[in-house]
Amino acid sequence: TFSVFMYRRALDQIEMSIAYPNLPVKVFGFLPGITTPGGASHQAINDIAVMRSLPNFIVFETGDATDVESVIPLANSVPGPVYIRMVRGALPRLFPASDKIKLDKARILTQGEDLVILSSGICTEEAMRAVEILNNRNISVNHFHVTTLKPFTDPEILYAIKNTKFGVITMENHTKIGGLGTCVAELIAEHCLNKKLKKIALNDTYLHGASKRYLMKKYSIDANALIAKVEELIGRKLYILNKDLASARIDTYFNEKQQEAL
């Protein structure tokens, strides 16, 4: 069902009838964040924060066709309850079908020492566009596509943050409170890492209803927003234009005109 109807209306049943007895129930929430035009009544902007707080639950988020195809067998392999934040409709295939989603293991999309960028869900496509241009400007990026929000203990992420030059940026289709940015902030604090963190996420507010593209721009969770945060971290302007981002070829598996209906 819609993510909002699942975690808002049935939270007591989920907590007492699934989480508390630690039952192997797999809960799917569709159309998260700004992926639905239905406005505040239909937009799940804080579902990760809520579901991460439930004992025993594992939390996944999908971002492309490969994630969607491979998350079900992965969820079934987990003995306890699982929440899957699921995109649907026309989806890009950003990763080859053989590159399946893994528990508590982010995909490493690019490697570099200047910045660490962690993106999730629909924001990864936007981040990939920006990272392509950044690499062309000699800014090296360690870019992770995060699909497990709980647990959040991937040692590759911790190592990258420890060794980055300028800092860390998170990018997500969720409120700034309790989502991917919070996961990373907790990781930095727990390991006493002296690293700057910039969050790209939805502000602590309810949203308008409109198209996904319009809302990503309006609420600053698109490629332009990522470039602006990079400029803040490195302390200089990059003069990257909209046409530069639009022309970025992000992956050989992506074809905007042949998105897959899943």
Predicted regions and their residues:
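Thiamine diphosphate
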Residues: 34-36, 85-262
